[in-house]
């Protein structure tokens, strides 16, 4: 049985004021993993019809800065957001349809990869994006190439 996230408590723990837009954005990001801003805005607007687009952008920025939401932006793609934060995972992106899936780190602890030379930086994260074809697109691609 999965537990229902306590968004108000998450906000308080991050020293953020609990507001309806913040709770609605957390709910939307949790319900729509890897969603773009438009999808999140639509979900929030459904729950709070009077919320502005700018308010959603501002909340996403605040939640990302507080570490409650993670922003990812694969090359050539719009920014997307997820609620899976603070763990050791990366992403797989379909080159054809753009779908994104989580993939756990294969080896080690965060940051998951060890740079051969960190150039004096204190490393705390490695962002890895795998690219390929999702199962649906690979089936379509195979069926097109083999009549």
UniProtKB/Swiss-Prot annotation:
Residues 1-85 are annotated as: DNA-binding. Zn(2+) binds at residues 34, 82, 91, 94, 97, 102. The keyword Cell division does not apply. Pfam families: FUR. Fe cation binds at residues 87, 89, 109. Disulfide bonds: none annotated. GO terms for cellular component: cytoplasm. GO terms for biological process: negative regulation of DNA-templated transcription; regulation of DNA-templated transcription; regulation of secondary metabolite biosynthetic process; response to iron ion; response to oxidative stress. The keyword Zinc applies. Residues 86-147 are annotated as: Dimerization. One of its GO terms (molecular function) is transcription cis-regulatory region binding. It is found in: Cytoplasm. Induction: Negatively autoregulated. InterPro entries: FUR, Fur_C, WH-like_DNA-bd_sf, WH_DNA-bd_sf. Transmembrane segments: none annotated. Its main location: cytoplasm. Gene3D superfamilies: 3.30.1490.190, Winged helix-like DNA-binding domain superfamily/Winged helix DNA-binding domain. Keywords: Cytoplasm, DNA-binding, Iron, Metal-binding, Repressor, Transcription, Transcription regulation, Zinc. Coiled coil: none annotated. Belongs to the Fur family. Represses transcription of the catalase-peroxidase gene katG and its own transcription by binding to the promoter region in a redox-dependent manner. Homodimer. This is Transcriptional regulator FurA. The gene is furA.
